[in-house]
Amino acid sequence: MKKLFGTDGVRGVANVYPMTTEMAMQIGRAAAYLFKDGNRRHRIVIGKDTRLSGYMLENALVAGICSMGVDVLVVGPLPTPGIANITSSMRADAGVVISASHNPFQDNGIKFFSRDGFKLPDEMELKIEDLIFSGKIDSLRPVATEVGKAYRIDDAVGRYVVFLKNSFPKDLDLAGMKIVLDCANGAAYKVAPAVLEELGAEVIPYGVKPNGTNINAGCGSLYPQVISEAVKEHRADLGIALDGDADRVIFVDEFGNEVDGDHIMAICATQMLKQKKLRKNTLVATVMSNMGLDIAVKRAGGKVVKTAVGDRYVVEEMIKGGYNLGGEQSGHMIFLDPNTTGDGVLSALQVLATMRRADKSLSELAEVMIPLPQVLVNVRVKEKKDITTIPEVALLIGDIEKKLGDEGRILIRYSGTEPLLRIMLEGQDKYQITGWAKEIADLVEKKIGGK
């Protein structure tokens, strides 16, 4: 059982345990020890998003890592996938991201990438925790010239912009395309506009003035209504919204209608099937994806493999099965041929390339998938108790599942990063499943709800 790490690294309110400077330094020391192999100089990349607390945690991590005799390459604000890319391209021993993704500014987090740019498996995170709580490394104190150094990589943004542009087909450009872009006042506020503009698009930017406290504040992928209204106002071709660390992306079409991750996966999977580029004709998605995605991919000659929720589990399944496309309904998209993790800007470029190649609007491409009605309700809880051990709740869920039969499903799971129970229902009748979802939520609230 992990004590610090959740589904996406260590996360919490900044300056409150476990997201304190003291713990960040300990995490840095443990990680530096773990990633050292052989008698040579080692290097770890550190990047962050635009949160105020990023400075505090960055310095603590740098101090911890250097105190173990490992050098640090500091890249500053950069999208999470950009940090993974820089880690791999600079042949560093590991990468560290300081970000809480789509969470509000007061939260922050720490997560790691291995030297090849992939997120760490659970066993590596457990080893970091063991080194911290066992005290095994407390007495290890390199001295004199063995202490690590910190270097700032000033051209990290430029390096990543070049990488992203190189992922776009050389025979295509975005000339004549008007794009509304919301960077959530987050890590992509420089990168994303630069990439789209250099490829020829007219960019109408939102969320590109971070001040440390406005990341994800009424903007970004959690607030698609912002780009929806802007697309209609500016008569743009589409809208693109990233989250705070730019590892996920949500679109709206030319009419302002949201196009979620499931639709994007359907668009990309069917296009790759046509081009015979989808490995093993298989798309990897999570259990949260709409059943309409399975139907669309099957109709195009492919299949969908499902995993637990979390882009790390999608990537693990992709590596294990030898697949090259995966993602989540929330907007995490993983293209393993050019990248190693979810990348909002790269995913947007893949969709834009498909639009250009097919000479179709986003609304036309999105017609490839017809989603089943789906309802998602979040209930804040005081404890993450196994739902099957609450008789009344388990009985109610069982009764509703019988009524749904083969024409729908219920998925109940706890958030890996927040004290929330997520209740998702899918079925043919939106009104009916909305009522059932509320019925379950009300009962859960009564039994284990928390303010």
Curated annotation (Swiss-Prot):
Q: Which Pfam families did the record assign?
A: PGM_PMM_I, PGM_PMM_II, PGM_PMM_III, PGM_PMM_IV
Recorded catalytic reaction(s): these are: alpha-D-glucosamine 1-phosphate = D-glucosamine 6-phosphate
Amino acids binding Mg(2+): 101, 243, 245, 247
How would you classify this enzyme at the top EC level?
A: isomerase
Give the cofactors, semicolon-separated: Mg(2+)
Q: Is Metal-binding there in the keyword field?
A: yes
Q: Which residues form the active site?
A: 101
Q: Which GO terms describe its molecular function?
A: magnesium ion binding; phosphoglucosamine mutase activity; phosphomannomutase activity
The EC number of this protein is 5.4.2.10
Post-translational modifications reported in the UniProt record: Activated by phosphorylation.
Q: Sites of the modification Phosphoserine?
A: 101
BP GO annotations: carbohydrate metabolic process; peptidoglycan biosynthetic process; UDP-N-acetylglucosamine biosynthetic process
Which protein family is named in the record?
Answer: Belongs to the phosphohexose mutase family.
What does this protein's UniProt record list under function? Catalyzes the conversion of glucosamine-6-phosphate to glucosamine-1-phosphate.
Put simply, this protein is called Phosphoglucosamine mutase
Q: Per the UniProt entry, what species is this protein from, by scientific name?
A: Geobacter sulfurreducens (strain ATCC 51573 / DSM 12127 / PCA)
Identify the gene encoding this protein.
Answer: glmM
